[in-house]
Amino acid sequence: MRIDIVTLFPELCDSFLSASILGRARAKNLFEAHCHQIRDYTKNKQKQTDDYPYGGGCGMVLYAQPIADCLRAVQAQCAAQGRAKPHVVFLTAAGRPYNEEKARELAGYDAVTLVCGHYEGIDQRVIDAFGDEEISIGDYVLTGGELASLVVADSVLRLQPGVLAEEKGYQDESYWDGLLEYPQFTRPEVWEGRAVPPVLLTGDHKKIDEWRGAQSRERTRERRPDLYDAWCESHPLTELPKWKRGENMRLVKNDEQLALCAALMAEGRRTVCAPVCSEEYLAKMTP
């Protein structure tokens, strides 16, 4: 994969991509990265890249011309390498929210170009002419798009084959399957009176996986109810193991109980079912 970052601060971006896990992967040519200075494509002697906005207002707006010429140069480089036309992403506060699903989508492209805004923003005409999409990494405003571009680059490049030691390294993490990651622990077993959960010391991988799954679901339910509700909808009762649904289906009395019991059997959320299902009923639901 090739990733290009169009920015006023290429040294900042390049240093990040040359450090730690990404730096080692880059040195092994597991991906190709280039950071481009917008000023190199200006046509004025002062190397000016911005001007006041039409219609008035505070701040300065980046010119369309140098960004457009830089993007054309990147397209030409990709074509010379036999690559597909790069997918162009503008990092803007007005973009669509970024998430793990989008990271996986971008990781599937052969070439991605990230354009960093600065000051008050970028002339919309170059976004309309070259942009495939606009992305925002959160509901807040930064002084420039460099940090946002590095967030996107990091989350995309780590998904490339060989960048992480094991594929499981990212498949078990938060958001990969729609849930937040379970808590992690390391040595010592007891730290300042706080012990590691006993199940993690048993060596029983089935029980450990069950504990981690329960912790992940509970953490998501408490901290990100939006993600949790979506997860429940994508994990209906019919997808559960037969031992969990064979007898249960016969006990369900109505559609409302069916929906509640689907969530119950998916993660053991008994409190949600309490208003509808008695304790005796719930006891029968769980083998």
Predicted regions and their residues:
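S-adenosyl-L-methionine/SAH cofactor-binding core of RNA-modifying enzymes
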Residues: Y63-H118
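SAM-dependent methyltransferases
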Residues: Q184, P188-M249, A262
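N-terminal nucleotide/polyanion-binding subdomain common to many enzyme families
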Residues: M1-A80, H205-D229
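Internal, active-site/partner-interface "lid" segment
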Residues: L147, L159-P198
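Hydrophobic/aromatic beta-strand patches that form the interior of the parallel beta-sheet core
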Residues: D4-V6, H34-H36, V89, V112-T113, ...
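Conserved GNAT-fold acetyl-CoA-binding loop/helix
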Residues: V252, R269-P287
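A short beta-loop-alpha structural element at the N-terminal edge
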Residues: N248-M265, V272-A274
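Structured adenosyl-cofactor binding patch, chiefly the S-adenosyl-L-methionine
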Residues: I122, V126-E173
